[in-house]
Amino acid sequence: MEQLLSLIPEAAVTHVQSLLSQSNLSIKITKKRLTKHGDFRRRVDGTSMITLNATSNPYRFLITLLHELAHFKVAESHHYRVKPHGIEWKNAYREIILPFLNQKIFPNPLCSLLALHMKNPKASTDQDFNLVMALRKYDAKTEKVVLYELEDGQLFYLDNGRAFIKMKKRRTRLECKEVESGRLYLFSPHAEVSIPPSTP
């Protein structure tokens, strides 16, 4: 519990302690995973587990925690099968996050963008471009750039060393061509990538 509370905004600690005291579940904090910020699952024995990525961004961590607590609440109150991010989850998420939606916990414009997001919350905050960019300001500083900031035709690299060229926008995604294979892939516009160092 102490580690978890150290990762959220100080103004949210009392609210979170109250929420967790009413919840019979285990919470595990793990190293960063590329595919998700957190997850909830029911174990075979019927107990519940939330796993959260450790992050230096207290606002991202808190949002993820509340997102997963909403899954827990739905699992506790609905014994029949419901959609993972259906209306039951959306309602539970709104109810849980409402006491946190103030500028003492989330500074503006983050608070306003989060309130807007909660009108119809997505399965992941990563699907909300404006919210993602606002949250990114509180991430640890990095030399990486956001893909949408690159010019069409510009070269970039993923963490695994694969090289791509940014091509064009397709609806909400960016089409990019892998240099080695020539295959086309769709990327999130806010994907963090590396670019070659500038030559003097």
Region locations from a protein language model:
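Metalloprotease/metallohydrolase-associated module, dominated by Zn2+-dependent proteases
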Residues: E2-S6, E10-R43, M49, T55, ...
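Conserved short loop/helix modules at catalytic or binding sites
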Residues: P58-F61
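Active-site recognition of the HExxH zinc-binding catalytic motif
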Residues: I63-E76
